[in-house]
Amino acid sequence: MATPMAEDSNFEDDQLHAMSTEDIIRASRLLDNEIRIIKEELQRTNLELDSFKEKIKENQEKIKLNKQLPYLVGNIVEILEMNPEEEAEEDGANIDLDSQRKGKCVVLKTSTRQTIFLPVVGLVDPDNLKPGDLVGVNKDSYLILDTLPSEYDSRVKAMEVDEKPTEDYHDIGGLEKQIQELVEAIVLPMTHQERFQKLGVRPPKGVLLYGPPGTGKTLMARACAAQTNATFLKLAGPQLVQMFIGDGAKLVRDAFQLAKEKSPCIIFIDEIDAIGTKRFDSEVSGDREVQRTMLELLNQLDGFSSDDRIKVIAATNRADILDPALMRSGRLDRKIEFPHPTEEARARILQIHSRKMNVNPDVNFEELARSTDDFNGAQLKAVCVEAGMLALRRDATEVTHEDFNEGIIQVQAKKKASLNYYA
């Protein structure tokens, strides 16, 4: 079966056979003219292309010249939509080319305290800009040349924990229930968000860890940070108490803004009772500043700008003096108590802290646990350290049961009666 191309070729051959010599010469001249016209068009297009390349090269050199550092730093104040068709035309008025432009215009404020209206934005796509963005502008034309990273207080940047903590839940003894509650409230919403969505449950925003000193609150927070791939910000309550008015609130605001940018994120606020005490009437400006800092924290936890991808872990020894507004549901939803360890937990803690030590097999940790009534986790660690130091003093190669007993006596002698204040 013949193809369509073969049929066309046969048809053209038949036409050529039917044409006279003069007709063939005339057709060939027409083809030569068409070829010459196409070559001239191609030559003209190549010349135009070379001209455009030259112009592009010149413009790129001008842009490179204008983009030379240093930039003038500015903030986007407002982004406006320009539509010149809506404006009434005035007869006899000069034509302003900028006013005829369609699209987005920008109002920005520079670091020299000037407010500038830009009908032409510059080298940045205006769709990628929003009010409050930090931009670099040309110091003469004020055209936006580049977007700059958000500005944060240097103290807030120092709060970010760069090195991932090495602690694990296996390093914490006797707190299985507390570990489970913390995992449910903080870790699961970050690692298995779909399980909460399937049940229609909104996970807690924050967790309060409270209990006597040395019971493992900070250790638990470090283990939680190690188990998730989230950014970890560590704040201390006294850090947020600043001398100047509004400085502490700005630190809280910047910390949550940095957390939002690096979400998912865990913010750990240690010793929250430094800023979270109950509000009272006071004429002292320092007390009012502490209360303002706490109000900013309340707003960030449960305000219009709150973010579910940011979790807060707060720790304190004095939960009884915290403000009720901080403790209510929707802010620090889950309260986890860290009591003094039980006898079984004390034995487990002693085993954890002595597992890297060369311990004599005859050491009875259950008996040691019965001898350490009312000891907290930190004191049990001190017992292991003291036992190791006593063995070192004897030039021994392993730590014996007697060393642990002597360590308990030394730590018990250093115990302060004032610790009962936290119980």
UniProtKB/Swiss-Prot annotation:
SUPFAM superfamilies per the UniProt record, alphabetical: P-loop containing nucleoside triphosphate hydrolases
UniProt keyword annotation of Coiled coil present: no
A molecular function GO annotation: ATP binding
Entry keyword annotation includes Translocase: no
Superkingdom of origin organism: Eukaryota
GO annotation (BP), single: proteasome-mediated ubiquitin-dependent protein catabolic process
UniProt xrefs under InterPro entries: 26S_Proteasome_ATPase, AAA+_ATPase, AAA_lid_3, ATPase_AAA_core, ATPase_AAA_CS, NA-bd_OB-fold, P-loop_NTPase, Prot_ATP_ID_OB_2nd
Keywords: ATP-binding, Cytoplasm, Nucleotide-binding, Nucleus, Proteasome
Any one of the GO CC terms: proteasome regulatory particle, base subcomplex
Gene3D superfamilies xrefs: 1.10.8.60, Nucleic acid-binding proteins, P-loop containing nucleotide triphosphate hydrolases
Localization terms from the record: Cytoplasm; Nucleus
Residues annotated as binding ATP: G211, P212, P213, G214, T215, G216, K217, T218
Entry's family note: Belongs to the AAA ATPase family.
Known function: The 26S proteasome is involved in the ATP-dependent degradation of ubiquitinated proteins. The regulatory (or ATPase) complex confers ATP dependency and substrate specificity to the 26S complex.
Name used for this protein in its record: 26S proteasome regulatory subunit 6A homolog
Gene: TBP1
